[in-house]
Amino acid sequence: MALVTKNVSFASGNRQLEGFFAQPEGEGPFPGLVVIHEVWGLTENMRYWARRFADAGYAALAVDLFTGRSKAICMFRMMSGMLLNSLNHQGIADLKATLNFLEAQPSVDRERVGAVGYCMGGSLAIAWSCADNRLKAIAPYYATNPKPQEALKRLCPVVGSYPGKDFTAKHGQQLDIALDQYGIAHDIKIYPGAKHAFCNEDRKNAYNQDAAEDSWERVLAFFGEHIQSKATV
């Protein structure tokens, strides 16, 4: 599929965020997707995922939450905010601003939007969804759950992928139980033998092609049901 890609910049409060936007050629409207990066920031791997989702029919925006700031300081602030008050910190505010920008694009159907996040980005996707009802579905990868855990009852549908050889596996198990309890549509899978960052081909010691491709197919199917199939209002 032919794609349109561009670098973008937009406001979040009194600062500017940057990102990489990819969508299929044409006017749309396309379902929108925010791609949230790992602790490494907006890398070429995150741009790859934005392009891959665009090739599947989405208008995808990979945001750089570390724009113009020290990566180490941003990582510390993000993780501290998630641990201490995970539903009210700068990362969530920046993601809301990112979705505002995405929804403002004429090619995007604002009634069909979701998010995918990896590592830190997956944890942020879960926390963000608890605080923003615009999201129709999210796909966290090797993510942790927000506090308090009761916040999970406000989640949208979730398709989560977790490596068996990682501390986040227990978070996936807890999320599965909570979503069952709250009656929220979900598909949580733990991949035995897989390691943290199993979807990142740049992490040669962690990449697991079988887990990466299986999770990709699961995410596409789940998003197809909960995002793409939603009627445009």
Description of each model-found segment:
Residues G164-K170:
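Acidic catalytic loop of the alpha/beta-hydrolase fold
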